[in-house]
């Protein structure tokens, strides 16, 4: 039986981020809808051709999205929130953009749909909204149009469709509460119609994505799979597709389904292939996701060959990417500045397609020449194991020497708080900001000129110093109590630290989509991490010299740096996090020596690092908390440690939030009207809290009365003596005029509350 290969999806944005540029040009009114549609058409044609040329047997169609593939599915099903609908009920690309962004070149602006993380990745999807009794109909034929495009170009294709149960699982009920699973029978006819249309076009296989099957689903959701797939069977062959984790716990549900094939993620999952092979119906096709779609490392194809060869001829087999290649940059050949040795360890999306082709050929015809080709390809990643760039004996020794004392502050919080009160003598309702101030065109230009060699180090430092001086003066004028230096020198909160730590490398063009038109370029962790010299001390010390008020030192925490980078695969995430923590522990010590008495360690990614299955949460939370404490615990008792977190759900991890033992935690609460504080109240959270009093994602300036009302609400839940006053998040994306006004109102609200207490 001949093995075929396929990818589950391909990056959409284009090698030069053409899609991003076309979207933003269209949104700004600088190009027409037809010009935007043409860019999409060109990108799809190019990506199909590139995959085919790299040796992919079946190219995916339906993985392209103008904003997000879950949003595309919503439109396919005619699921458009009332506030985003066209007057005549039609659906067009502007409908899609109104749901994603809240506005488009046509139609009335309305609040955008909610956005959240796609499983445990750094990609975000638009959350479908459901209401009781809503109607569904085939409303957006993008998938069928793209299938026609690909067939006209002569490609062998496999359409991709987000499965009905995962789609419902990912959505939220709006308005009156009801069980959204009850909508299953209403959406299935649309799926049937789409599959019938694909069958008419001669399509043999459809990839139907049900990643919810890797989760611990409630029984009623698992029970829904059988009738759902009973309704969908018969028109085309269905490849039930899972990714991001194992499926063993749901295997009984899966193997009873009327589908013709199953895709499993063999990279992130830990399913025993022999057991899986034995447990599945004999006639099923088994697709094995062996090439990691979420990282940038070259595969050891020789190892995969040895692992997979026993399965050859046991059943129909396909080889695929573990998940969509959406999460990987496009082409390693674009990287001209990477060191040759390091570059030889990497594979981006196009290289991963070539890996699939090479491995498939070897398994189909395992002759000496093919095996030698596999060995030659795998040699660099094998040589990496002993590279001096990867291993640092000092880091490994230091890690091994960590004791339980290294992760605990000297005194408990109550005693520390007393010494800190004496040192800082802050008023009631102390005011501060989260860290960054507006990143003006001037600041960005300064950094770019320095990076590209147009500005020498001395002039760059002079320029940054001026911006820090301005930030301190602004805060003094506003009357804030604890100041920040404004982070003018930082491009990105993770990239900045990665650039100053050994063990990281950076790409020129390693862009991946985060959401909509937003792309990120994650650093790559290639080896043991250490800090060759102080990173933030010079700027913090300078800022502190300009004022009598305390200035916070600002660090990005170890878990966030790990989660927002491409990690190495040869050691555990725990090991990487603790190496970063040790490097930043030295930074805490140096900041203290420089006279900085308040140090903030941001951990916005702590919650998003959670494994998909609750059974694995405790182990993760244990080492994530330990990494934070290892970073912070070197601080003296009178040094106040702050942390900042921005997400909407604390209930299920309150124990761990408290275990961080930060003296002050600042959180994002304004959009939830302080409801988030319920978690802290119910838990009787013992330390100090700064609930965000205004939403920095909006240019709207909150009134003094509005902020005051929010603070009063907060004081009903948390004793006023433990409350701080601050915005939700950093102010880097805002302009100075609204920043000044909002902070002035915030300070005034705090002053009014203080006066009441006198």
From Swiss-Prot:
The keyword Mitochondrion is annotated on this UniProt entry: no
Disulfide bonds: none
Record keywords, A-Z: Amino-acid biosynthesis, Metal-binding, Methionine biosynthesis, Methyltransferase, Repeat, Transferase, Zinc
Pathway(s) served: Amino-acid biosynthesis; L-methionine biosynthesis via de novo pathway; L-methionine from L-homocysteine (MetE route): step 1/1
Substrates-to-products reaction catalysed: 5-methyltetrahydropteroyltri-L-glutamate + L-homocysteine = tetrahydropteroyltri-L-glutamate + L-methionine
BP-aspect Gene Ontology terms: methionine biosynthetic process; methylation
Active site residues of this protein: 697 (proton donor)
Binding positions (L-methionine): 434-436, 487, 602
UniProt-annotated binding residues for L-homocysteine: 434-436, 487, 602
Cofactor: Zn(2+)
Annotated positions binding Zn(2+): 644, 646, 668, 729
Domain of life assignment: Bacteria
Record family assignment: Belongs to the vitamin-B12 independent methionine synthase family.
PANTHER family hit by this protein: 5-METHYLTETRAHYDROPTEROYLTRIGLUTAMATE--HOMOCYSTEINE METHYLTRANSFERASE
Job description of the protein: Catalyzes the transfer of a methyl group from 5-methyltetrahydrofolate to homocysteine resulting in methionine formation.
Name this polypeptide is given: 5-methyltetrahydropteroyltriglutamate--homocysteine methyltransferase
The species this protein was found in: Yersinia pseudotuberculosis serotype I (strain IP32953)
């Amino acid at each position: 039986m001949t093995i075929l290969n396929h990818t589950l999806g391909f990056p959409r944005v284009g090698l030069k981020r053409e899609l991003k540029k076309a979207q933003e040009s269209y949104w700004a009114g600088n190009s027409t809808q037809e010009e935007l549609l043409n860019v999409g058409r060109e990108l799809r044609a190019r990506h199909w051709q590139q995959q085919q040329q790299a040796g992919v047997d079946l190219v995916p169609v339906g993985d392209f999205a103008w904003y997000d593939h879950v949003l595309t599915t919503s439109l396919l099903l005619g699921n458009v929130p009332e506030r985003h609908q066209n007057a005549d009920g039609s659906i067009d690309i502007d409908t899609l953009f109104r749901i994603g962004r809240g506005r488009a070149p046509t139609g009335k602006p309305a609040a955008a749909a909610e956005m959240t993380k796609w499983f445990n990745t750094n990609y975000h999807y638009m959350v479908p909204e459901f209401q009781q009794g809503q109607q569904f109909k085939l409303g957006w034929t993008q998938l069928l149009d793209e299938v026609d495009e690909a067939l006209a170009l002569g490609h062998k294709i496999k359409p991709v469709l987000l499965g009905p149960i995962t789609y419902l699982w990912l959505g939220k009920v709006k308005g009156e509460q009801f069980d959204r699973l009850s909508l299953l029978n209403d959406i299935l006819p649309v799926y049937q119609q789409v599959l019938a249309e694909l069958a008419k076009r001669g399509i043999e296989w459809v990839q139907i994505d049900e990643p919810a099957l890797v989760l611990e689903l409630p029984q009623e959701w698992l029970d829904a799979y059988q009738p759902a797939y009973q309704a969908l069977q018969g028109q085309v062959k269905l490849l039930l597709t899972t990714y991001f984790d194992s499926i063993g716990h749901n295997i009984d549900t899966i193997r009873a389904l009327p589908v013709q094939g199953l895709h499993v993620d063999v990279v992130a999952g830990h399913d025993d292939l022999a057991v899986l092979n034995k447990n599945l119906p004999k006639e099923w096709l088994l697709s094995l996701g062996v090439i990691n779609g979420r990282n940038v490392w070259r595969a050891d194809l020789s190892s995969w060959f040895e692992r997979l060869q026993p399965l050859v001829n046991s059943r129909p087999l396909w080889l695929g990417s573990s998940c969509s290649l959406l999460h990987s940059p496009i082409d390693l050949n674009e990287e001209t500045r990477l060191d040759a040795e390091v570059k030889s360890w990497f594979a981006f999306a196009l290289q991963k397609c070539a890996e699939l082709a090479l491995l498939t050929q070897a398994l189909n015809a395992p002759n000496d020449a093919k095996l030698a080709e596999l060995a030659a390809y795998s040699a660099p990643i094998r040589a990496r194991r002993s590279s001096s760039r990867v291993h640092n004996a000092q880091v490994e020794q230091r890690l091994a020497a960590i004791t339980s004392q290294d992760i605990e502050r000297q005194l408990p919080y109550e005693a520390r708080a007393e010494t800190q009160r004496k040192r800082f003598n802050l008023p009631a309702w102390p005011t501060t900001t989260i860290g960054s101030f507006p990143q003006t065109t001037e600041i960005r230009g300064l950094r770019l000129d320095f990076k590209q060699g147009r500005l020498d180090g001395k002039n760059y430092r002079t320029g940054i110093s001026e911006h820090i001086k301005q930030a301190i003066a602004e805060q003094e004028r506003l009357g804030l109590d604890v100041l920040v230096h404004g982070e003018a020198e930082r491009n990105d909160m993770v990239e900045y630290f990665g650039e100053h730590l050994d063990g990281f490398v950076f790409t020129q063009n390693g862009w991946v989509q985060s959401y909509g038109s937003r792309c990120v370029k994650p650093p790559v962790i290639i080896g043991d991490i250490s800090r060759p010299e102080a990173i933030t001390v010079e700027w913090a010390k300078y800022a502190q010299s300009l004022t009598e008020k305390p200035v916070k030192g600002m660090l990005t925490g170890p878990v966030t740096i790990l989660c927002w980078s491409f990690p190495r695969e040869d050691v555990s995430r725990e090991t990487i996090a603790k190496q970063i923590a040790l490097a930043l522990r030295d930074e805490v010590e140096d900041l203290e020596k420089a006279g900085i008495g308040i140090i903030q360690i941001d951990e916005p990614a702590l919650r998003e690092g959670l494994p998909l299955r609750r059974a694995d949460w405790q182990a993760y939370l244990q080492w994530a908390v330990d990494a934070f404490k290892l970073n912070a615990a070197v601080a003296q008792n009178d040094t106040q440690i702050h942390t900042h977190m921005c997400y909407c759900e604390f209930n299920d991890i309150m124990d761990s939030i408290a275990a961080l033992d930060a003296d002050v935690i600042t959180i994002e609460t304004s959009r939830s009207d302080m409801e988030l504080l319920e978690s802290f109240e119910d838990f009787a959270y013992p330390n100090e809290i700064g609930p965000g009093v205004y939403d920095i994602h909006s240019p709207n300036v909150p009134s003094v009365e509005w902020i005051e009302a929010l603070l009063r609400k907060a004081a009903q839940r948390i004793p006023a003596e433990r409350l701080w006053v601050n915005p939700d998040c950093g102010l880097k994306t805002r302009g100075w005029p609204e920043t000044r006004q909002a902070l002035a109102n915030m300070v005034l609200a705090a002053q009014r509350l203080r006066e009441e207490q006198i």
